[in-house]
Amino acid sequence: MSRTLGTVVRGVRAPIFREGDSVVDITVSTVLNALSENDIPARDGDVVAVTESVVARCQGNYATCEQIAEDVRAKTGGKTVGVAFPILSRNRFSLLLRGIAMGAEKVVLLLSYPSDEVGNHLVSLDQLDEAGIDPWHDVLSLEQFRAAFGEVVHPFTGVDYVAYYKSIIEEAGAQAEIVFANRVTAILPYTDTVITCDIHSRQRSKRLLTAAGAKVVLGLDDLLTAPVDGSGYNAQYGLLGSNKADDDRVKLFPRDAKAVAEAIGKAMSDATGKRVEAMVYGDGAFKDPAGKIWELADPVVAPGYTSGLVGTPNELKLKYLADKEFADLSGEELKNAISEKIKAKDAKKSLVGNMVSEGTTPRNLTDLIGSLCDLTSGSGDKGTPIIYIQGYFDNYTNE
């Protein structure tokens, strides 16, 4: 009898991970126990994924606002510092802004509008149209912004982020000036020392600032790249991918995620006798169709993964085969024809640009699988920071 299930994704309940725990040992033992208790046989191509937050927690990869401030002072001189294009998020940016402000005498905050990089809106496009404001040309002061739009409250959080970020800066002991523009160089009339806080466009922002004459250009990925007074750190991503741990600390993106994934994959493969892949995942790369927010506030979906997860899908479009190429067939004859077509597919030859693959998804496997994991585990109280996936690499012919 042929298999009736394809890809199966399971959230695995795990114990609470604590600083100093072995994320590899706990992940592997938890998954093996779940497979045994539920009579699930491991198969070649299975994937074990663990969320980045528990990896960082086990590593003790944290930093305080004062440690951030110390790094800011050392790298900027601590006078007037520009903070360009942060996202609007209490979880992701409020403590980073406090740390930066603690390390400076004045902060010039440049906010993009009508929304931040990931789609959190200050105002709507319709409001811009009504006010006659061109977001690609017009640079607004706080007074001009308030005159045009008044108080702006985020529809989901109920927070006026303009007022909130201004209060954070001032409560940290720095002067605050807020400017609204979509050209990062608009901050240079105010200061030549800039921390650009965008995530996915940060390299371009750094290049534009440097070319326009900024003297000090940093990104969030240039802060906390090494320990500061005993802090955690991330040599590659710095403060990118961090989020609020408590009222004075952020949890940084995990270090050595590739080594963690490889250790989990090897231990699972050794224990099961099957080829098991592994990854460390963070934010999924999906966009909320209602709120218009792109959920990827981490620098990457998956900071670490095993080699079997490199690449993109190389699939045929079954609908095209059934409706076009084999339109005159039906029943078992159609099934056999499609199966033979799939079996004849050269796995090493890309199908990009070929009609039979049109409508499939030419995205990185790690982005697809990591997004699937993030949607499965959620960000609340499910208690499933480990995801076990079976059948992801199967096709219609696999029994």
Mark where each language-model region is.
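Conserved mixed alpha/beta catalytic, RNA-binding, or beta-rich assembly cores of soluble enzyme
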Residues: 2-44, 53-399
